[in-house]
């Protein structure tokens, strides 16, 4: 319908859902159509450009140039106070050391963005790409776990213990 009216490329639809308190059924209503690039544009374009892939309109699956299904998990708001003070250079070191980057041979891994907000706000964005939805989620979860560990405050168990003997 939108194409017949001249719309091209992407669009986004905003929904509102309300649960009926008596029947517990959800009422889902489309409230707005956005004929512009939306929040999912960046991760999808990242997937498309890195894999040179395409959307299979018959199945709804995204396929790489080698016809391998590809999936992604993305956020533009991985935000934790403990990430504050982490410089983009530090992040690059962690990415390299832990091999968290996108690997062009397997076409899996993570692409980072919004690194300018990392040190001051403890926030960054990332797109994790896998050959299955589960793999994409595992890659994303590993990135978060590695960043959490790298920025964790030492616990009491890790801190040097005071000498229990009086001096």
Segments predicted by a language model, with ranges:
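ATP-dependent carboxylate activation and anion-phosphoryl transfer catalytic cores
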Residues: 1-167
């Amino acid at each position: 319908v939108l194409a017949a009216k001249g719309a091209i490329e992407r669009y986004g639809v905003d929904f509102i859902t309300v649960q009926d308190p008596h029947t517990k059924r959800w009422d889902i209503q489309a409230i707005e159509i956005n004929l512009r690039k939306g929040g999912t544009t960046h991760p999808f374009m990242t997937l498309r450009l890195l894999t040179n892939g395409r959307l299979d309109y018959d199945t709804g699956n995204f396929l790489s140039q080698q016809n391998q299904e590809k999936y992604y998990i993305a956020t533009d708001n991985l935000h934790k106070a403990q990430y504050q003070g982490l410089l983009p250079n530090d992040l690059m070191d962690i990415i390299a050391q832990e091999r968290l980057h996108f690997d062009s041979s397997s076409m899996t891994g993570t692409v980072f963005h919004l690194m300018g907000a990392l040190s001051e706000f403890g926030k960054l964005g990332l797109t994790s790409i896998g050959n299955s939805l589960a793999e994409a989620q595992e890659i994303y979860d590993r990135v978060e776990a590695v960043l959490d560990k790298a920025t964790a405050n030492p616990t009491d168990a890790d801190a040097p213990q005071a000498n229990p003997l009086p001096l």
